[in-house]
């Protein structure tokens, strides 16, 4: 009923699990685990009552609620218990692996649920069910719609779920391998667990490893970190002395780049790779095709060519657009966003994906170019400028601004 992660393939376990299985078979460092395959999901949603209700309704939110309300079958719970015992009953990460996730056409970055520090068969079963239900969250439905797909529980899409040992990472991050033979590996890194980097809640250190092995880096002010405390995730303040200390040294950046090249060669193309470091050892948490190119490296603007009212951040998604600034601090502000507005926000949570379909551009206070939100902005082909401190107070609602996501600037219309 369950599939060892080493044996996972895309056809039965989804793109994320299939890639991790391939990496394990190649001898690369991936945390051990297993997969709840498509068959278990299909068995759950083919329950006659659920399938009939879903088939009679176009309300996919109702489908999500029905899945959430259904207990996981006893046979699945028994299999989960045995598999967890074989791992030694550690805290685990429970992660989505949908059929259309982590493909070369669409990343679905951050669109489905994943859970860290889950412990015990009951909690794992609940997390598996939540991953299944997340196929029908508003953000996942909207993302599939933007990609020209839809689906009901009795039809398409389908979801597998990965269960792996949880890693208490000292440093985590993301890297994009080169798009061409002379390209550079781009790496972002910060303290603690990976959601801070992929979720854009911190501005990470950025490293660029050239083909000749030379490393350039930009060290950020990494104010917070995410860590496990028991079965809870806690956000901690980073000590002052560590905030502007590089999260990794140049030798580690070079080691990551070499590992990235090995993974890209195995899959035959540029890869978006999530990684973590525990006790000095690098682990690979995810590898998927790069779906949209990064903006080209930009040269710093000089005082003579930058208007006084221009704010400068990190280029996140190329292009230039002029529109009305809309300050968005949370879901309570969503209704105020109109088509063509430029979102100005502390960071962009994956739940905000529906806004990216109507927004003309995005400005954030934190986050890196390899974060989930930046990836989705590039897939939607809307300009994004990231990591402008205090952007939500320095810019104002209803003012006209121009953002250049290729060089990383935001300028008020009257500048």
PLM features: what roles do these ranges have?
Residues 1-162, 170-171, 251, 264, ...:
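N-terminal beta-alpha lobe that positions the nucleotide/phosphoryl donor
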Residues 33, 274, 377:
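Conserved, mostly hydrophobic/aromatic
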Residues 110, 265-291:
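Conserved metal-phosphate-binding beta-hairpin within the catalytic cores
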Residues 113, 165, 174-193, 287-292:
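Short beta-strand elements
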Residues 189-270:
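Conserved catalytic alpha/beta cores of large enzymes that bind or transform nucleotide phosphates
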């Amino acid at each position: 009923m369950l599939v060892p992660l080493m044996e996972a393939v895309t056809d039965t376990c989804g793109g994320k699990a299939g890639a991790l299985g391939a990496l394990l078979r190649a001898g690369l460092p991936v945390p051990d685990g297993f997969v709840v395959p498509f068959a278990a999901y299909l068995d759950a949603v083919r329950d006659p009552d659920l399938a009939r209700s879903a088939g009679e309704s176009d309300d996919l939110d109702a489908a999500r609620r029905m899945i959430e309300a259904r207990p996981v079958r006893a046979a699945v719970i028994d299999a989960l218990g045995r598999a967890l015992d074989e791992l030694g009953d550690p805290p685990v990460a429970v992660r989505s692996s949908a059929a259309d996730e982590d493909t070369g056409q669409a990343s679905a970055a951050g669109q489905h649920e994943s859970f860290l520090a889950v412990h015990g068969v009951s909690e794992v079963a609940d997390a598996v069910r939540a991953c299944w239900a997340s196929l029908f969250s508003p953000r996942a439905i909207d993302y599939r719609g933007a990609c020209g797909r839809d689906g009901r529980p009795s039809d398409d899409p389908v979801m597998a779920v990965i269960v792996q040992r949880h890693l208490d990472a000292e440093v985590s991050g993301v890297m994009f391998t080169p798009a061409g033979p002379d390209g550079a590996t781009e790496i972002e890194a910060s303290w603690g667990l990976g959601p801070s980097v992929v979720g854009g809640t911190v501005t990470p250190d950025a490293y660029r490893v050239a083909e000749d092995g030379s490393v350039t880096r930009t060290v950020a002010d990494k104010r917070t970190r995410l860590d496990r405390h028991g079965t809870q995730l806690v956000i901690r303040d980073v000590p002052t002395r560590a905030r502007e200390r590089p999260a990794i040294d140049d030798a580690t950046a070079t080691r990551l780049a070499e590992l990235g090249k090995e993974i890209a060669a195995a899959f035959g193309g540029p890869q978006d790779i999530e990684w973590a470091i525990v006790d000095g050892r690098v682990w690979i948490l995810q590898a998927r095709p790069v779906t949209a190119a990064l903006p080209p490296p930009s040269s710093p603007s000089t005082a003579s060519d930058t208007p006084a009212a221009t704010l400068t951040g990190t280029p996140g998604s190329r292009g230039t657009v002029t529109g009305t600034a809309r300050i968005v601090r949370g879901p309570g502000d969503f209704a105020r966003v109109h088509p063509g507005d430029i979102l100005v926000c502390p960071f962009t949570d994956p739940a905000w994906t529906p806004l990216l379909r109507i927004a003309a551009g995005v400005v954030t206070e934190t986050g890196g170019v390899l974060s989930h939100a930046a990836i989705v902005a590039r897939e939607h082909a809307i300009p994004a400028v990231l990591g402008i401190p205090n952007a939500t107070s320095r810019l104002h609602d209803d003012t006209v601004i121009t953002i250049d996501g290729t060089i990383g600037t935001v300028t008020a219309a009257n500048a």
